[in-house]
């Protein structure tokens, strides 16, 4: 039976370490080996960086990490859930941000079995990732 786990994360870089540790624990429960867990942690870290900096119109104030976990399969959604965004993003381009086709998304696609970039009706972004054994 699939289990669902959801985290609500402030859109600040200092929370990425916590997110990586949490998703590593979830992946271990789903019975992935150490190399697969490292791949999942790296992909989720890249997705969180992409979503938190590429939220609708600026830096996301918060985002969610949702996992659907069953033995040998992990489905992960990272979604911008902000009601608002930091205004400084509107006046300049973030020099550290990749475009959707850039290295971060390439890394995610190379590490996960399936990757989708989704827009919800409110125009907010979601990165869906699936890893199977």
Region spans (language model):
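Conserved ATP-binding N-box helix of the HATPase_c
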Residues: 34-59
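Bergerat-fold GHKL ATPase/HATPase_c domain
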Residues: 1-42
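Residue-level detector of secondary-structure transition/capping positions
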Residues: 27, 45-48, 82
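Conserved beta-strand-loop-beta-strand hairpin that lines the nucleotide-binding pocket
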Residues: 1-6, 51-133
């Amino acid at each position: 039976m699939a289990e669902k786990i959801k985290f609500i994360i402030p859109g600040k870089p200092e929370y990425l370490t916590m997110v990586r540790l949490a998703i590593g624990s979830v992946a271990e429960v789903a019975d992935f080996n150490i190399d697969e867990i490292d791949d999942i942690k790296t992909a989720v870290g890249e997705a969180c960086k992409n979503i938190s900096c590429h939220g609708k119109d600026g830096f996301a104030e918060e985002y969610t990490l949702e996992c659907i976990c069953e033995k040998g399969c992990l489905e992960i959604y990272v979604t911008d859930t902000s009601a608002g965004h930091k205004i400084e993003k509107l006046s300049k381009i973030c020099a550290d941000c990749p475009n959707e086709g850039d290295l971060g998304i390439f890394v995610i696609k190379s590490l996960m079995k399936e990757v989708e970039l989704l827009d919800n009706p409110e125009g907010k972004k979601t990165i869906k990732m699936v890893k199977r054994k």
